[in-house]
Swiss-Prot record:
SMART domains: BRLZ. Residues 100-129 are annotated as: Basic motif. GO terms for cellular component: CHOP-ATF3 complex; CHOP-ATF4 complex; CHOP-C/EBP complex; cytoplasm; nucleus. Residues 10-26 are annotated as: N-terminal. This is DNA damage-inducible transcript 3 protein. The N-terminal region is necessary for its proteasomal degradation, transcriptional activity and interaction with EP300/P300. It is found in: Cytoplasm; Nucleus. One of its GO terms (molecular function) is DNA-binding transcription factor activity. Residues 76-90 have a biased composition (Low complexity). Residues 133-147 are annotated as: Leucine-zipper. Residues 10-18 are annotated as: Interaction with TRIB3. The lineage of its organism: Eukaryota, Metazoa, Chordata, Craniata, Vertebrata. Heterodimer. Interacts with TCF7L2/TCF4, EP300/P300, HDAC1, HDAC5 and HDAC6. Interacts with TRIB3 which blocks its association with EP300/P300. Interacts with FOXO3, CEBPB and ATF4. The gene is DDIT3.
Amino acid sequence: MAAESLPFSFGALSSWELEAWYEDLQEVLSSDENRGTCVSPPGNKEEESKSFTTLDPASLAWLTEEPGPPEVTHTSQSPCSPESSQSSLAQEEEEEDQGRTRKRKQSGQSPARAGKQRMKEKEQENERKVAQLAEENERLKQEIERLTREVEATRRALIDRMVNLHQA
C-alpha cells in the first residue's frame, strides 16, 4: 500500500492557516456529533477518540476539495448562540451541498476523477514552469558568459592603456 502525498507540505502552512483548519475541523466534528448544535472542543482523550470514530465519511468531503485560503464564516453574533449556530450551520451546509452538485454537474466527473484531473493539470503546469525556468536559466548563463568576455576585454584594454601611459 503506497502512501499518497499531501497537497501541501507541513512547512508551508502558517500558524493562522493551521488555526483555520483546526477550527474548521472542530466545526465539522461538532455539527456531526450534535446535529448542528454548538459545543466546546472535546476536553479529554476519550471524548476525542469517540468523536473521530463516529464521523460520517460525507462530513469529511471538504478534504477532497482543492486547498486554498480558508473562508471566513464568522458573524457578529456569538458562535454558540442558538440562533446563529443552527441557522448559519444549516445555511453553510446547504450552500456547500449546492456548490458540490454544481461542480459535479459542470465537470461531469466524480470527485476522485476531478481530483486526478486537477493533479494532472497541476503536473503539466509545473512541467511548463520547469521548461520556462530552464530556458531562462540558459539565457542567463549566456548573458553571464557575454558579460564575462566583455569585462575581460575591458580589463585588458585598461591594462594596456596603463602600460602605455607609463611607457610614454
